[in-house]
UniProtKB/Swiss-Prot annotation:
GO terms for biological process: translation. GO terms for cellular component: cytosolic large ribosomal subunit. Keywords: Ribonucleoprotein, Ribosomal protein, RNA-binding, rRNA-binding. This is Large ribosomal subunit protein uL3. It comes from Geotalea daltonii (strain DSM 22248 / JCM 15807 / FRC-32). SUPFAM superfamilies: Translation proteins. Transmembrane segments: none annotated. Part of the 50S ribosomal subunit. Forms a cluster with proteins L14 and L19. The keyword Ribosomal protein applies. The keyword rRNA-binding applies. GO terms for molecular function: rRNA binding; structural constituent of ribosome. It comes from the Bacteria. Belongs to the universal ribosomal protein uL3 family.
Length: 211
């Protein structure tokens, strides 16, 4: 059964394993998420559930959002996400999904929005080496030639050039759940995940985990 939760990145810390190893972890507030809608293959063409996260007052949401959440018997939510599932009958509208959906040792994929760095040059954005810093050199951080004039007389697609860095959807795969605090809905994920503090993330079962 596929599992997934919407969460919020709290920050990074470190814990120590029983054998004394120091493990860097990212703390994620995962859930509670409420099942808002069920989609079936017969009606919608695929099996999925829609979950809501970060409850807010109905007065602060538009009428369409309030009406959509009414069937779940809960107020409005700030964020929604669909999750493909194998057996949609395992869920009911109004079910609450918490951090205990995952357990220590699970392998997961985490999706978030990377921190935006603004407009950056090719050295920071793509890791170009750059030119010499010595006296007399007139080539330091410039990208250099981007193509020939006669042939091909154009710049190829996907040419590495200066531009916007960060602020894009990033998925880090095959991370390990180190610890789960069900009481506070916290999941400790080994390593780093995309996004800034309090950034929205989506946790789901890894698609490349070894069976």
């Amino acid at each position: 059964m596929n599992k997934g939760l919407i969460g919020k990145k709290i920050g990074m810390t470190q814990i120590f394993a029983d054998d004394g190893r120091r493990i860097p972890v990212t703390v994620v507030e995962a859930g509670p998420c409420v099942v808002i809608q069920k989609k079936t293959k017969e009606k919608d063409g695929y099996n999925a559930i829609q979950v809501g996260f970060d409850a807010k007052e109905a007065a602060k949401a538009n009428s369409a959002t309030v009406g959509h959440c009414k069937a779940a018997g809960s107020g409005a939510f700030s964020f929604f996400r669909e999750l493909r599932v194998d057996n949609v009958d395992s869920y009911n509208v109004g079910d609450v999904l918490n951090a205990d959906l995952f357990a220590a040792g699970d392998v997961i994929d985490v999706t978030g929005t990377s921190i935006g760095k603004g407009f950056q040059g090719v050295i920071k954005r793509w890791g170009f080496k750059g030119g010499r810093s010595s006296h007399g050199s007139r080539f330091h951080r410039a990208p250099g030639s981007i193509g020939c004039s006669a042939t091909p007389s154009r710049v190829f697609k996907n040419k590495k050039m200066p531009g916007q860095l960060g602020n894009e959807r990033v998925t880090v795969q095959r991370l390990k759940v180190v610890r789960v605090d069900a009481a506070d809905n916290l999941i400790l994920v080994g390593g780093a995940i995309p996004g800034s503090t309090n950034g929205l993330v989506f946790i789901k079962d890894s698609v490349k985990a070894k069976k």
